[in-house]
Amino acid sequence: MKSFIRSFLVIIALGVLAGATLIWSGLYNVAADEPHWKATLWLVNEARERSVEAHSRGSVTQPLQGERLVERGFPHFNETCRLCHGGPGLSPLEFTQGLYPKPPFFPSKEVQQELSDSELYWIIKHGFKMTGMPSFGVTNSEEDLWAIVAFMRRLPTLPPSEYQAMAQRAGKS
């Protein structure tokens, strides 16, 4: 048993040494225009998905029905989220082409199906480290955050003309 523990500790120490060498050597390229290594991409994606899943479990999902809630979420989405995530008939702004990873296109039904309401709420509230996705929980109330979720859930079925009409009513284009 002692030899197993000793071997295990040596393997751990070698892993830490290899990781430290990789970091200090500058070998790993952190540039946004250089994709992650496959192993790094897998690790980051798994960590993100498991973290969101685990931390969003405690979120009490709010009812998302009602036009007033959707209307309340629109200005928040239009002024901030749309820039990176696009909108009905609207592509994300040009600067997002340089982001890595690319922000998901939320008007897409397929993208919407990947996240539960509580997961989407958690992401909006807390953001993601080192991705460009900010935490909106520091500047928005719980009610506003749920209104953003309600509005985002409408995106896949919202015609571009209706989105534009909402923007005009809100005084934004």
Segments from the language model and where they lie:
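Periplasmic c-type cytochrome electron-transfer domains
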Residues: 2-71, 95, 115-119, 136-151, ...
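Sequence/structural segment immediately N-terminal to covalent heme-attachment motifs in c-type
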Residues: 66-90, 122
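Detector for the c-type heme attachment site
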Residues: 84-90, 125-126, 137-138, 153
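Short cysteine/histidine-rich zinc-coordinating motifs and their immediately flanking basic loops
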Residues: 93-98, 163
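Short glycine/proline- and charge-enriched loop/turn segments
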Residues: 99-105
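Glycine-rich active-site/cofactor-binding loop and its immediate structural neighborhood
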Residues: 108-125, 132
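Extracytoplasmic/periplasmic copper-protein system
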Residues: 159-173
